[in-house]
Amino acid sequence: HIMNKLTIIDTGCANLSSVKFAFDHLGYRAEITRDIHKIQSANKLLLPGVGTAMAAMRNLQERNLIDCIRNATQPMLGICLGMQLMTEFSTEGNVATLGLMNGQTDLIPNSGLPLPHMGWNKVRYTPGHPLFAGIEQDSHFYFVHSYAIQPNESTIATSCYGMDFSAAIANKNFYGVQFHPERSGKNGA
């Protein structure tokens, strides 16, 4: 099943094995790699991420993966920090990110709610987007983050935590979700 082959880009974060396990469990054959040729020949790409934007960008740079990611033509999904890396800039360490779509990542403004934003929250998406096919409007997904991307023209879904923020973004073949699909049960699948 070539369709079910998933290539996870090794961003050097700690939780890669749990992401791989979750996708294996969904019936994908997931492989974690930092090999440029494997990434280029991949069927579907996953850009995971936990930790800081600065550390992740440094890891990608050291592995010469930045151009490889920017030039990818196959569908790529960024999760959590992986989604944040897809925009132009992160104020977390003031680091230029991959620039795959507009927007920047900022600390969630203090509205008296605890950070990180952690737990289940409702997601409202733009109707008709294939990423949310078969998912009910205002479904709940699992979030853990302190930084967020303000809604902009790349936003295809929002959630609210003291303010509206982008729960999902998309541009061409690049997709990002702020929530953790691998921890969101049936809707995450």
Predicted regions and their residues:
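Extreme N-terminal starter segment of soluble prokaryotic enzymes
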Residues: 3-7, 173
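Amide-donor transfer/coupling interface in amidating biosynthetic enzymes
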Residues: 71, 104-189
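Structural alpha-helical scaffold elements that stabilize or flank donor/cofactor-binding regions
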Residues: 38-39, 68, 168
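Short acidic/histidine-rich motifs immediately flanking catalytic phosphotransfer sites
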Residues: 39-49
